């Protein structure tokens, strides 16, 4: 890894990584099925970038990274996976002033053999992933930290993205179909957050934390049966700190009230398909199914931390 000042205002960096990974596994998984893996990978992951100081407190940057990642044990248990490969291009702008900190980041990610969630789960409840050929993620991320005055702090953020399989095939009713571009599973196109903090003293602070997650699919075939609806949830967080005596340096009391408006939503679930070959002899019918994990309504956590 190296960083170098190239000329006035310009700084470059380069980061070279060489990874070697070996998998050797032999045994049994669910039931009498045998499980054997003997794979070795060598990955070269280079990264380089350029930063330009536009003005005091403002920087523009561009970077490129090539990343390669091996499958994990669960991937091997559920198939014959290949390592995924990524070319990542990013362009961004940072602002850092006493009243405003902001960052804009635009990314373009080209994947080959990306290991994506299928929506299905295995016999022990672990999510199943599979390689999907070519896929792409493009997006923009905006983050702000604004000091409104000496007591109020505002921290909004938003991420807009397009997350797609580029040439997805699916076997429906016994016939292999090219679905073309489909949405990647568990990849909402819109995610936003907001925090408004009130800090009247160094001892006490209270904040309202909000999060919005847009509609997403739990599978890769754009089936409405696999939809996770958009949701908006708000939490309240408070912290009070004091120093009682020389024996206890600090006592910190915290309160986190989750989902203060008691929103009814599901943030996760699973989706599966199977071929029905027995209901109608000589006919194959693809059946879709889904399950959801409802989230708790209003709930709270409180705690006390002592520092001696």
What are these regions (language model features)?
Residues 1-55, 76:
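Signature of Gram-negative outer-membrane beta-barrel scaffolds
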Residues 18-24, 64-70, 97, 106-112, ...:
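Transmembrane beta-strands of outer-membrane beta-barrel pores
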Residues 12-16, 60-62, 102-104, 154-156, ...:
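Transmembrane beta-strands of outer-membrane beta-barrel proteins
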Residues 70, 186-246, 261-262, 266-271:
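C-terminal beta-barrel architecture of Gram-negative outer-membrane proteins
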Residues 53, 59-63, 83-169:
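Membrane-embedded beta-barrel scaffold of Gram-negative outer-membrane proteins
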Residues 6-9, 55-57, 99-101, 151, ...:
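Short loop/turn motifs that connect adjacent beta-strands in outer-membrane beta-barrel proteins
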Residues 112, 154, 162-164, 215-217, ...:
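C-terminal beta-signal and adjacent terminal beta-strands/loops
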Residues 20-21, 108, 130-221:
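Gram-negative outer-membrane beta-barrel transporters
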């Amino acid at each position: 890894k190296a960083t170098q000042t190239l000329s006035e205002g310009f700084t470059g960096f380069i980061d070279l990584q060489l990874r070697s990974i070996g998998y050797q596994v032999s045994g049994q998984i669910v039931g009498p099925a045998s499980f054997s893996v003997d794979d070795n990978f060598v990955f070269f992951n280079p990264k380089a970038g350029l930063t330009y100081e536009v003005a005091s407190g403002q920087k523009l940057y561009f970077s490129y990274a090539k990343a390669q990642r091996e499958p994990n044990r669960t991937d091997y248990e559920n198939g014959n996976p290949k390592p995924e490969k990524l070319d990542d291009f990013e362009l961004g702008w940072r602002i850092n002033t006493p009243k405003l900190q902001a960052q804009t980041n635009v990314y373009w990610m080209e994947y080959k053999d990306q290991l994506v969630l299928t929506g299905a789960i295995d016999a022990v409840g672990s999510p199943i992933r599979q390689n999907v050929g070519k896929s792409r993620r493009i997006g923009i991320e905006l983050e702000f930290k604004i000091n409104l005055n000496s007591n109020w702090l505002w921290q909004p953020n938003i991420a807009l993205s397009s997350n797609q399989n580029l040439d997805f095939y699916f076997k429906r009713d016994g016939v292999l179909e090219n679905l073309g571009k489909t949405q990647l599973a568990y990849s909402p196109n819109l995610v936003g957050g907001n925090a408004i903090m009130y800090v009247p003293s160094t001892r006490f602070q209270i904040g309202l934390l909000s999060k919005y997650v847009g509609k997403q699919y739990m599978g890769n075939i754009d089936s409405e049966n696999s939809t996770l609806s958009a949701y908006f949830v708000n939490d309240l967080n408070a912290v009070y700190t004091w120093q009682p005596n020389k024996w206890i340096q600090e006592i910190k009391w915290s309160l986190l009230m989750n989902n203060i408006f008691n929103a009814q939503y599901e943030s996760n679930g699973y989706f599966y398909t199977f071929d029905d070959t027995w209901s109608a002899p000589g006919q194959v019918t693809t059946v879709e199914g889904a399950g959801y994990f409802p989230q708790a309504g209003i709930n709270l956590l409180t705690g006390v931390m002592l520092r001696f």
